[in-house]
Amino acid sequence: MSQDTDVRAADPVLGRLAEAILIPPFPGTAAPGWVLDALGRGLAGVTLYGQNIAAPGQVSAPTAALREATAGDGPVIAIDEEGGDVTRVAFAEGSPYPGNAALGMVDDTALTRAVHQAIGADLATLGINFDMAPCADVLGAADSPAIGTRSFGADTGLVSRHTAAAVAGLQDAGVAACTKHFPGHGRTGTDTHEAIATIEGGLADLRLVDLPPFEAAIRAGTVAIMPSHLRVPELTGDLPASVSAAALTGLLRGELGFTGVIVSDALEMRATRDLFGIPRAAVLAVAAGIDLLCLGREGSEDDYLAVREALVAAVRDGALDGERLEEAADRVARLRGGLARTRSAAPAAVGMSSDSAGPVGAGSVGAGSVDAGPVGVGPGASGLGRVGPAVGLVAARRAVQVSGPRRTLSHPVIIEVEPRENIAAGRFGWGLGPWAPAGSVHRVSAAGRLLNGAGLGPADDAASAAGPGPVDAAGILAAAAGRSLVAVVRDAHRDEQTKSLVSALLAARPDLILVEMGLPFWRPPEGTSYLATYGASRASAHAAAELLGLAPA
């Protein structure tokens, strides 16, 4: 008898309750049999990642299969689609929407709502009904490795109003918003993918700086909120908020009055995995007040079974109150019912191609119903963002900040410095390549490796100039002799090697044009030609390409 059969045979009621609060991942572009079987028994749904998406147009068929396999109301089909640097649907080429930092820079809440309505419309067309967005984190640490351009900014009021606008936009399109990362991840210097983070300061600071955006999201009707694996010593002690009853049941539900679904951040993240292991973290999270458990991108069928078995065993052993598990399952069931009603009321999906995109919003899945008018985004080869006016590109254009002299490019050499990977964003398509002359773009690492392109080896090593290998400022300068030189960076302030490389290039070539596609905390000398896009989305790159004369405006 398999572990799967063991658990269900031993206590089928508890097994179904446990399945009813899980949204596991799966490998590949089609759900395997175990996922389809579990959906038939009452599994809450799934979480999609880039590994599940070969191309946007491919997504509708597997999401339809997930719905067809599901017993009762349709499944929760969740994804991280924030716009900007965090995209799963458009990871190959980059998002056609600017991210939160760019939208916060523009500070037009109507535009933020329109962009998120467009994101929601794209997701709804693909059969995705739950977006783990927006980020409501107030940026307090310039070196925030987890948040950065995912935040609307460093001002609590600005973040609050744009969080509310983003929630409204997504839910205008019939997609549930899951606001994150409660109680606020923007003032930490640790990425919870790698270790537990701590918010320094007391509850007074938390209430003043970090909580107002979540209060704004609640007022806007956010369907769900995601706590983070970080601790606030005065509130949670040594525990992360994600397993703290004081944070979830006391603060979020009791003080802030949130009555929607509380969704765990990925349980595979080291902040909780290293402390408890995934199964025990799941039990502690539900006991503290979590309703829906996200296992994470790498979660396997074995992880799913282990979590389900741990929940069942915890109820049997008295470590988890059975009524708490029932409460969580009931709340998720109501979420699924609301999503199913929203989908049935929506216009039929028209599919996505290089020439068209899907339907506009059909009404909010939140507290009220909001009629959604036509929206659209900047075009990309994926077919995303081709409904109505190019709101994504419009927003990206408005966000770009320009300083220094305008220069006309002549046979440019474009150096793109690959940053250290942000785990939440992963590897995604970025840069000026789609608009640059053939052979002009060279991707290098800050550590001095040519990642693609040719002809940029060290000046004294002709052999390495034939392809990927070592690269230094001298080699770049030699290759750019008599040509325009453009350097493109992301979050240069975080990496001394990136700053050193750019500084060496500027010392020899003060006519260099520097394009910052992250946060512009590190600035070149006054008089440098400089563009800051506040994110590395395809839309932001397109806007920069226009200003550089690489793309028609």
For each feature predicted by the language model, list its residue ranges.
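Short glycine-enriched loops at secondary-structure junctions
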Residues: 27-30, 79-87, 91, 129-139, ...
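Preference for extracellular/luminal or secreted protein segments
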Residues: 1-41, 275-553
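Catalytic domains of carbohydrate-active enzymes, especially glycoside hydrolases
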Residues: 37-49, 118, 125-130
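Short, acidic/polar
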Residues: 27-39, 111-122, 207-214, 277-282
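Second-shell residues forming the walls of enzyme active-site clefts
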Residues: 12-16, 25, 52-71, 75, ...
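A charged helix-plus-loop insertion that forms the helical arch/lid used to bind
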Residues: 93-107, 151-153
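A substrate-binding/cap region within the structured catalytic cores of diverse enzymes
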Residues: 106-124, 138-144, 148-149, 163, ...
